[in-house]
């Protein structure tokens, strides 16, 4: 029981809710970038909330099914089609659909968003690493030997013992209008002009953004503290400011190890 990867898409990996209990050992959290859509994905296909899903960024994967009676779902703001009995249908996010042997699903792209999710009833036959199905690419930890899903991979499936029940929900991925910021321990290390500029200026997300951090381009933040800065650990959501003065929002691959940049 498997599905074949015809096209891997961009940054396609297995993810779950992450490794929340190993941060003190220097192991990053990992996990799905959009936890809400992860949970919805598993709920719609009848899987446990801690089961793995496939996460993709921008362009999604294309799969060919190698067994009958698979119940699937795609979540996020995503365009996709599926080929069933040689006919192509436009897919609808947050609505399950069934596929049979040699049918295909083509997840074309996300729309005005970064990440999308795919799963099947019964889940994927993969092993946990450190009590999680999450993939951490930089350290090669997780299913698939810690690697991205690639062309010609055969993704093994668990046998689905539950009856297939078609489900759908009306769900809108709302646009965030405001981001709340709390002053950190290093806030007073920046000039008054930089503090004011940070809250009043616009910043552009750059193409250097990845699962470790969201890199921003905009007004430079000037650090006025000349002596060495005490190193502190990092967590998701911390805004780190390297020597070039361009902020980085720490995300799920953030290393808990101390850094010398201001926050």
Sequence positions of predicted segments:
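Intrinsically disordered, low-complexity, positively charged segments
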Residues: 2-79, 185-223
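Structured core elements
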Residues: 4, 62-64, 71-73, 106, ...
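Short active-site-adjacent structural elements
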Residues: 14, 248-250, 259
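Extended, compositionally biased flexible segments
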Residues: 31-129, 255
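Residue-level "contact hotspot" at macromolecular interaction interfaces
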Residues: 37, 98, 148, 240-241
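Conserved, well-structured core segments that form or line functional sites
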Residues: 79-80, 88-90, 94-225
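Acidic/His-leaning functional-site neighborhoods
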Residues: 211-213, 217, 224-252
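Single conserved hydrophobic/aromatic residue that forms the stacking wall/gate
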Residues: 253-263
């Amino acid at each position: 029981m498997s599905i074949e990867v015809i096209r891997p898409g961009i940054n396609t990996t297995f993810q779950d809710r992450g490794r929340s209990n190993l941060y003190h050992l220097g192991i990053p959290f990992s996990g799905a970038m959009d936890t809400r859509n992860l949970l919805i994905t598993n709920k719609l296909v009848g899987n446990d909330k801690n089961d793995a899903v496939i996460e993709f960024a921008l362009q999604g994967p294309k799969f060919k099914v190698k067994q009958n009676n698979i119940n699937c779902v795609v979540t996020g703001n995503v365009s996709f089609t599926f080929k069933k009995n040689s006919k192509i249908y436009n897919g609808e996010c947050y609505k399950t659909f069934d596929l049979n042997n040699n049918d295909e699903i083509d997840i074309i792209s996300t729309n005005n968003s970064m990440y999308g999710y795919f799963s099947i009833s019964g889940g994927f036959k993969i092993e946990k690493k450190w009590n999680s199905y999450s993939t951490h690419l930089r350290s090669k930890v997780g299913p698939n030997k810690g690697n991205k899903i690639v062309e010609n991979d055969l993704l093994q499936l668990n046998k689905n013992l539950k009856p297939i029940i078609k489900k759908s929900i009306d769900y809108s991925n709302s646009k965030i209008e405001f981001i709340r910021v709390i002053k950190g321990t290093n806030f007073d290390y920046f000039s008054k002009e930089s503090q004011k500029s940070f809250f009043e200026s616009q910043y552009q997300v750059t193409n250097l953004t990845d699962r470790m951090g969201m890199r921003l381009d905009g007004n430079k933040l000037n650090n006025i503290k000349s002596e060495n800065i005490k190193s502190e650990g990092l967590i998701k959501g911390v805004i780190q400011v390297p020597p070039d003065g361009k902020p980085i929002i720490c995300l799920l691959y953030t290393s808990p190890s101390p850094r010398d940049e201001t926050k």
